[in-house]
From Swiss-Prot:
Subcellular location: Secreted
Expression (tissue specificity): Expressed by the venom duct.
The protein's name: Conotoxin Cl9b
GO cellular component, one term: extracellular region
Organism for this UniProt entry: Californiconus californicus (California cone)
Keywords carried by this UniProt record: Disulfide bond, Hydroxylation, Neurotoxin, Secreted, Toxin
Length: 28
């Protein structure tokens, strides 16, 4: 889901690995 996942270099938030190929954007 592009609205809730971003590459780790997004910079807008802390990106936590959700699985082997996606990341969840979480406010720091």
């Amino acid at each position: 889901d592009d609205e809730t996942t971003f590459p780790c270099n997004s910079g807008r938030c802390a990106c936590l690995p959700e699985d082997s190929h996606s990341y969840t954007c979480q406010s720091p």
